[in-house]
Curated annotation (Swiss-Prot):
Similarity section: Belongs to the universal ribosomal protein uL23 family.
Superkingdom of source: Bacteria
HAMAP family: Ribosomal_uL23_B (MF_01369_B)
UniProt protein name: Large ribosomal subunit protein uL23
Keyword Zinc-finger set for record: no
PANTHER family, per database record: 60S RIBOSOMAL PROTEIN L23A
GO-annotated biological processes: translation
Pfam families from the UniProt entry: Ribosomal_L23
Gene Ontology CC annotation, any one: ribosome
Length: 97
């Protein structure tokens, strides 16, 4: 049975030109919760997608400073996880969970 906390760890897949380029190297990019750790991300991907994860790299992308009608605001920070899968395994992120 899938633990419901796994759905809180992985927020969404990242579908950009750069993330599709790394998919050639058996890697997938996800937006994850800010407080998620690498072991939690690994467990969530393995449980939700049924694949073997060999490595997890994370990066916190700082939000941009935006101005609207003279007021300064800031976009939220986003944590990205680059998940490396075992040889011969893949995840189709264009379909849902």
């Amino acid at each position: 049975m899938t633990d419901l906390r796994h759905y809180d760890v992985i927020v969404s897949p990242v579908i950009t030109e750069k993330s599709t380029m790394v998919s050639e190297h058996n890697q997938v990019v996800f937006n994850v919760a800010r407080k998620a750790t690498k072991p939690e991300i690994k467990a969530a991907v393995e449980a939700l997608f049924g694949v073997k994860v060999t490595a997890v790299n994370t990066a916190v992308c700082k939000g941009k400073v935006k101005r609207f009608r003279g007021l300064v605001g800031r976009q939220s920070d986003v944590k990205k996880a680059i998940v490396t899968l075992a040889e011969g395994q893949s995840i189709d992120v264009s379909t849902g969970l």
